[in-house]
Amino acid sequence: MPYPHQTDKKEPGQKGGPVEILSPAGSLDILKCAFAAGADAVYAGGACFGARAFAQNFTEEELLEGIDYAHIHGKKLYLTVNTLVKEREFDQLYNYLLPFYRQGLDAVIVQDMGVMEFIREQFPHLPIHASTQMTVTNAISASFLEQKGVTRVVPAREISLGEIRQISDRTDLEIECFVHGALCYCYSGRCLMSSMIGGRSGNRGQCAQPCRLPWRAEHDRKERDFLSLKDLCAIDLIPDLVRAGITSFKIEGRMKQPSYVETVTAMYRKYTDLYDSLKEGKQDAFRVSAEDRRILMEAYQRRGYTDGYYTRHNGREMLSLNRPAQAQKKETAVKTGKEQPLQKKINGKLILSPGKSATLILSAALTGGHAEVTVTGDTVQEALSRPLSREQLQKQLQKTGNTEFAFQDLDIRTEGDIFLPLQSINALRRTGLEKLKDRITDSFRRTDDVQKVPCIPCSAPSKERPLGEIPLFVSAMSAEQAWAALSIPAVKRIYLSDTVWAQGGAQELLDKARSRQVEVYVSMAEIYRREAEDFYGKHLDAIARNFDGAIVKNLESFLLLKEKGFSKPVDTGASAYAWNRRACAFWRDLGADFTEAPLELNAQELGDLDRSRMILPVYGYFPVMVSAGCIRKHTKACTRKAGWTSVTDRYHKKFMVRSECLYCYNILYNPDPLVLFGQEKEIRALAPGALLCGFTWESGERTREVLEMFRKWHCGGQAPQWEEGFTRGHFKRGVK
């Protein structure tokens, strides 16, 4: 038998239904404020596993109460579990989610592929939303996630309306997109800057936002906010967003004040409803009033506003380059008239007959049905002097106070002159409202028998291996680096950037590698969007013929290779996150051969994973950001050719920036290289499947020098003394 709230009618946020207004809730009070202002749903974080670790967040009791409050009022609550999860945390994750699952949690928002698989196994009836932290950029990956049981996708904030439209056309997924609030400079889920600078990982909800500080670009003497975007405000684009197939308008701001959430929610509610109310053919008349725009802008003032990436790939106008003199954040309370918590309208019938128990029947409309309860109280007496009037009874019953309910219609039926003590009437009302609340919330409870699934066992523990027995792989961004790698006998595999192939002249290198029995894999794009789709549409056949395999940095590239029948081995880079055994199994089941170790796990945490096919980076400047923005374009130094520039932070650390014009994105690299030379004890104990030296802007000569140092150490020699600045990354410390 279906629960009262279940229906075939499309609800807000569902494909084919009304657009959902999804608001942030940093506390129970803000949750109630958001619903009163018109939100259809809220997203909230609990004590752990959320991407806002420094927000107030909810206690377990508050979340349970919030779930019930949402359901009483026909709303929804989505829980954020949108961080990467370590292997030893899965027992905690199970215990954390179980009470919310049973309470009737509406969905969970996830980033980690291992967590996605875990929830499918452990909590089969819990809808899964793919977080923007997954960096979903096209219909290929969205469709795959749909097949994996995901019901909603939050695509990367950088994709265009056209790309969103493709996801909508090719899947049945709900599509949730940000319409208001802060924008990151980096593709969400791809930023390691805060992690590497100060140990606070964005992938663990602890971003310190160093990007918001002033930076100095190579071609600009003045410090500016080169890595800080204005806040998003897409209210004028509501018609375009709806036509693109977006089903949920998401407002950013779980660390914002109630006044902000109330004002922004009310404005998007008002103008989404306005657009819905316009008749076909008259929707071009949609306009936002100047007064409402002012109210919306004043709700939070810091960086200025942009309508984001929906209609552009990037642009200098999106940056808050010139910080105002009063750059402190300012939130303005704007009265919308919706400050009071919601009270659900209910109907009641009171039946009072002398000599019989007082009877109260309460009912409430629910989506797809209704809930009804009947309660009885004390025996009604015949009045001897002052009978109770209908007005007295009505006044007493309507004192619902701070409960979730208010009477819409109250039918009072009495026989003759009756009397009942006021405390009896109050008790009858309280009992009735409590039972009605229970009847509504119980309809959302999950009572299925949830059994804890055993953890995925690690394959046979890796035995300690002598350093010299672990093969060396090299990644090269230039032909010169690859040629240098070929001169070192220890090198067994080269990952060659696809941009080298695009420039031509790689064939001789490939032939030489083949003659020396060195494998060459193509290293695919950091982000797979239309530019990458166009490139591989033209070159994949030739690449498949000439390369020995591929290494991918994202799910989209992997799925493209599978779709096109690429039959050679495919490895995954560090950004195809595999923090736990389930995530490793996810990539392995997809067909991955080797998997690069995550850069944010320490040696002990890496030891919890299967290392037999793990690639351990031991040298290299690794990416800390991948951005759709372009530093050279923003500093008016764009040559429309791929190349290098740099930005310098307040501590005079220089971060090299690669402008990758083939795919139109920038990659920012850590200022110091990762160097694990000298960590042979830990490396031998880990016994990874391969070691990796990665080269970015190094010359061919410098590449050869580094590899020669590695070769001597690899063969049992003393670790070289690194004279320049370097980092051990998280190999020793890890992230919290």
Stretch-by-stretch model annotation:
Residues P2-A37, A41-R52, L64-I67, H73-Y101, ...:
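Surface-exposed amphipathic alpha-helical tracts and adjacent flexible/coil segments at the periphery
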